[in-house]
């Protein structure tokens, strides 16, 4: 092999190596910018809902004084059973165990309970697994166990839950009503 041919051969080797490195680099850049999860996998995060329960000065008023009340918050897949249920089922599992278990298994994703006094604020955190939050529309529901149950389902509230990684929901509880702030 002559000296001239060796230089050409070495030049071609360098050129083909350069093309290979350039091709690998280009593929890496394309994968990184295309949102491909192979390189930059984004961790799936659970949703966190911080619930602030706020009691008014007339909370659970019995005619003489305001009284403490138990308040429950739920993240639900469906609110129909919640809206039609007797409140005693939601607060006392032994009242109708079969209905309570059915509600818990079919509708409840997560829940929290607070014992609220007049002019008091309680907070609770509800964590919603990413797998549930990502695949379905969820609803937020709250109910209070009043001394005198109100008419017209004013003791409960339901609304669509936003799909935000972290959010705060304020639930106001009055004499005989529950409302989202």
Model-derived features: positions:
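Bacterial N-terminal signal peptides that target proteins for export
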Residues: 4-23
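Short amphipathic, basic-aromatic surface patches that mediate peripheral association
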Residues: 51-62, 78
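Tryptophan-paired
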Residues: 89-134, 148
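Short, surface-exposed ligand- or partner-binding patches at beta-edge/loop junctions that are enriched
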Residues: 133-150, 154
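Glycine-rich, aromatic-bearing surface loops/beta-hairpins
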Residues: 147-181
